[in-house]
Amino acid sequence: MHIMEGFLPAGWCLVWWLIALPFLVMGIIQLRRMMKEDREYLPLLGVCGAFIFILSALKLPSVTGSCSHPTGTGLSTICFGYCVTAVVGAIVLLFQALLLAHGGLSTMGANMVSMAIGGPIAGYAVYKLMKDTSINIYVTVFLASAVADIVTYIITSFELALAYPAQVGGFLASFSAFFSIFAITQIPLSIMEGVVLALVFKYIIQLKPEIILKLHVFSEEQIAKARLAGDAEVA
């Protein structure tokens, strides 16, 4: 979904940067508070950043002035929330723009709003709604990750349609065209990403459940049930 350098008009680049900045500020404040409380969170933050960087660098071509790929934001969103994810995602997008020519500096605001902010907010909402229910935590993780992924591309389609409305049908026609093209690759990718993140959480819960408990991601009872189910599968 990385919109390439120079593809958006300057006015829209400025708009998306202005929308992104408050989330970055809030995320930085939260990060500083977290680091003062416990610097042991740093390794997991690094893992979250690497997860986003690697998955979002796996590009599939798309004919929308962009590309399709997993976003990888689900892990950070569930563990740290969407504001911290905005900062982690912004750092990833900056490195990708400078080192991989993936996205751009002028369009970084738009890319942040879609991948580092909008998608994570949607994924976090799904996680919070399902967290305290009886639904299996791996299903919760799967859906939160998949929704964060697909909403990222809905927002990217929205951004592109605002910048380039169709001559016939205007914004809605343009939005439908952009997202229908993205959906061909992105719906399967979002499902795959959800499965991958569920497996990652299964690994963490089996080996280092105290990380999940310390961050209050899931309750001790939920983790115990998940570990018991995992042990039963092995047996």
Swiss-Prot record:
Provide the membrane topology annotation. Multi-pass membrane protein
GO MF terms, alphabetically ordered: cobalt ion transmembrane transporter activity
First-listed, main subcellular location of the protein, grouped into a coarse class? membrane
Where's it found, cell-wise? Cell membrane
Q: Which GO terms describe its cellular component?
A: ATP-binding cassette (ABC) transporter complex
Q: Which domain of life is it from?
A: Archaea
Q: Which residues cross the membrane?
A: 9-29, 41-61, 80-100, 107-127, 135-155, 160-180, 181-201
User: Which Gene Ontology terms describe the biological processes this protein takes part in?
Assistant: cobalamin biosynthetic process
Q: Which Pfam families match?
A: CbiM
InterPro entries linked to this entry? CbiM, CbiM/NikMN
**Keyword annotations for this protein?**
Cell membrane, Cobalamin biosynthesis, Cobalt, Cobalt transport, Ion transport, Membrane, Transmembrane, Transmembrane helix, Transport
Q: In which pathway does it act?
A: Cofactor biosynthesis; adenosylcobalamin biosynthesis
Instruction: Quote the subunit structure annotation.
Output: Forms an energy-coupling factor (ECF) transporter complex composed of an ATP-binding protein (A component, CbiO), a transmembrane protein (T component, CbiQ) and 2 possible substrate-capture proteins (S components, CbiM and CbiN) of unknown stoichimetry.
UniProt similarity note: Belongs to the CbiM family.
Q: What does this protein do?
A: Part of the energy-coupling factor (ECF) transporter complex CbiMNOQ involved in cobalt import.
Write the protein's name: Putative cobalt transport protein CbiM 2
**Origin organism lineage:** Archaea, Methanobacteriati, Methanobacteriota, Stenosarchaea group, Methanomicrobia
Q: Which gene encodes it?
A: cbiM2
